[in-house]
Amino acid sequence: MAVALLEEWCKIMGVDVQKSLLVVDIPVDCGEPEIQTVLQEALKCVGSYRLLGKIFQKQDNTSVVLVELMEDTDMSVVPSEVQGKGGVWKVIFKTPNQDTEFLQRLNLFLEKEGQTVAGMFRALKHEGVSPATPPCTSPELLAHLTGQAMVHGQRPLLPVKYCKMRIFSGSTAAAPEEEPFEVWLEQATEIAKEWPIPEAEKKRWVAESLRGPALDLMHIVQADNPSISVGECLEAFKQVFGSTESRRTSQVKYLRTYQQEGEKISAYVLRLETLLRRAVEKRAIPRNIADQVRLEQVMAGANLGNVLWCRLQELKDQGPLPTFLQLMKVIREEEEEEDAYFEQESREEPGEREGSGCWNNSRNN
């Protein structure tokens, strides 16, 4: 990262990182006189400065220069980019509150997960760092440890006991913090299938997320069969709180779902996917042909442009059939191209169009 390069370079040069800038994306054939000319104009707002050095970045095939500010400067007036040879040169600097902002974002993330910075150190069993020391720990170390937790191990990022499940009650009048049954069921199913923890612990975490009638049902099924698995509990929840529509109804509802007027194709596909998954759960549509059925329904039920229709037809004929996410990627790419085209059209000034028309008329005459 550019900020990391700035910090390391400042350490080597023995200068204050808070009073230094990196200018990146400079063409390699741009000499120091040219760089000085550009910076003299662009950095008038910072007062006096000096160019400390230039290095070559092989991966980008560009040059980077380090600039030291000689006066106390309000960093908010420093431009984030300057116009130089070859295009835009980016200006990188570190604001005094940058570390504080990182810690605030990290603490907010951990708070949502029911965790603390000290708890994360204990969970990672980081050697040489006491749980009492995290407030004094650098943001760089915290970022490293958080990434370490995401990369290593099969368990969740944080200790499972701190992972909050969504709330579900099954009540007719749901509280604001509650989730619909399908959303809650998705997370509960993930716990049942993927979390490497004992069945008793899984059932306890599921039970902690329940309120009202849903919690009553959990107590009933456990009383009937104390050794019941989480998966069997969830099957009972599907029977009581899940959709009651028949297999045939779910199939027909899916096949008769079309793109609505004014609805983007990507929004239609997302809406369609919910119905497809429900039909698969009801065994109205075989799971092994879900990708084929999805693609066929999109081609039949959406108002596709010629380019997108041809792309989807090619996928259908030549394969492999796209998954839901792969299909969404193709559709979003096409939508973005269309949006860019229409935006370009809307930017054309009426005078330009009239001028073009007059020029055509003069040619005809």
Swiss-Prot record:
UniProt-recorded name of the protein: Paraneoplastic antigen Ma2 homolog
Entry similarity comment: Belongs to the PNMA family.
Pfam families: PNMA, PNMA_N
Residues carrying N-acetylalanine: A2
Region (Disordered): 336-365
Tissue: Expressed in the cerebrum, cerebellum and testis.
GO cellular component, as recorded: nucleolus
Basic and acidic residues: compositionally biased ranges: 344-355
Key words of the record: Acetylation, Nucleus
Cell compartments where the protein resides: Nucleus, Nucleolus
Domain of life: Eukaryota
